Amino acid sequence: MAPRGRRRPRPHRSEGARRSKNTLERTHSMKDKAGQKCKPIDVFDFPDNSDVSSIGRLGENEKDEETYETFDPPLHSTAIYADEEEFSKHCGLSLSSTPPGKEAKRSSDTSGNEASEIESVKISAKKPGRKLRPISDDSESIEESDTRRKVKSAEKISTQRHEVIRTTASSELSEKPAESVTSKKTGPLSAQPSVEKENLAIESQSKTQKKGKISHDKRKKSRSKAIGSDTSDIVHIWCPEGMKTSDIKELNIVLPEFEKTHLEHQQRIESKVCKAAIATFYVNVKEQFIKMLKESQMLTNLKRKNAKMISDIEKKRQRMIEVQDELLRLEPQLKQLQTKYDELKERKSSLRNAAYFLSNLKQLYQDYSDVQAQEPNVKETYDSSSLPALLFKARTLLGAESHLRNINHQLEKLLDQG
């Protein structure tokens, strides 16, 4: 031990060492600032309360441990290796690139981080609809190593997720135990217990799904049984002849049920007096029911007939209104036709009278000619009854006399002038 009064002499450091230390501190501070600025650089979009923080912690551990490692990132973050051996080789190469003094520490850290990564894979498998965020291209050269490491961790997560899905599908098809699946699908030895937990979780999910299906089938069966029991129960209805299904009422169903309950109750009673009283009560009630049903049926029939008569009356009333409108429209035409009819009737009567007169006149002339032929030497005598005929015959003679008088008067005028 050194005495208290003495101070340890500081080792002399060269300017190159100081500069390298300053540059390292600057790079670390710039990395921290870049990590704070570029928060959306994570490949998967998880909620804040999920286990994605483990992925961030893995990236920070890799920052502290592997400042000099460089990886070539894949074409996209969801790249899958063709074979499990390729994945194990790649993991072996990445592990061999670390310095030998830090391999033990790295393996212990990765075993804890891979468990948290697989838990985050569970969440991402439940939400397959999430999309990847593009990695920003505007980051500086200092941030390139960090982004490559994060892409590498995302690649590991995606490969483990696809391997878990493949192994679960093969286990469902072949129905093999989960131990053989986990032994085939694990690459590094530290990830085996976490993958076994994953398989157990998937098996529990499949069991719960099967239980849900079984309960759904049971519900379907119970529903079908209930429907079958409902269909097996037949409802008896009392309906008289000529009754329609639309006229069925509550009493039509109550009466058969009343008869059924009466029979059941009568079988349980042993006293004759009670049976007689129940029988009389049953008969009276049944008669009342039947009377009410008949009266209700009669009432429905009367209502139906009344409705039919009302509809017929309404139709006839409508037709009467139409006829009245038509009569009002044809009334002037009727008047015109009536006047024409009266005129034609008068003409017909006048023509009939004229024809009768002419026939009588012809008969009279025929009689006169016959008498004159039989007695030609007898002188004709005319009485007062034949005066109109004589005037009619003398009209021509009177006309000739007046004509001669006119001629004589004109000749006298001419002579006087001359």
Swiss-Prot record:
Changing T78A: Insensitive to PLK1-induced degradation. It is found in: Cytoplasm; Nucleus; Chromosome, Centromere, Kinetochore. Phosphorylated by PLK1 at Thr-78, creating a self-tethering site that specifically interacts with the polo-box domain of PLK1. Disulfide bonds: none annotated. Residues 12-42, 145-165 have a biased composition (Basic and acidic residues). The keyword Nucleotide-binding does not apply. It holds the Pfam family CENP-U. It comes from the Eukaryota. A motif (Nuclear localization signal) lies at residues 6-23, 303-320. Residues 180-193 have a biased composition (Polar residues). Residues 1-11, 124-133, 208-224 have a biased composition (Basic residues). There is a cross-link at K185 (Glycyl lysine isopeptide (Lys-Gly) (interchain with G-Cter in SUMO2)). Residues 1-76, 88-227 are annotated as: Disordered. The modification Phosphoserine is found at S108, S111, S116, S120, S136, S139, S141, S190, S194, S232. Expressed at high levels in the testis, fetal liver, thymus, bone marrow and at lower levels in the lymph nodes, placenta, colon and spleen. Present in all cell lines examined, including B-cells, T-cells, epithelial cells and fibroblast cells. Expressed at high levels in glioblastoma cell lines. Belongs to the CENP-U/AME1 family. Component of the CENPA-NAC complex, at least composed of CENPA, CENPC, CENPH, CENPM, CENPN, CENPT and CENPU. The CENPA-NAC complex interacts with the CENPA-CAD complex, composed of CENPI, CENPK, CENPL, CENPO, CENPP, CENPQ, CENPR and CENPS. Interacts with MLF1. Interacts with PLK1. (Microbial infection) Interacts with the N-terminal domain of Kaposi's sarcoma-associated herpesvirus latent nuclear antigen (LNA). This is Centromere protein U.
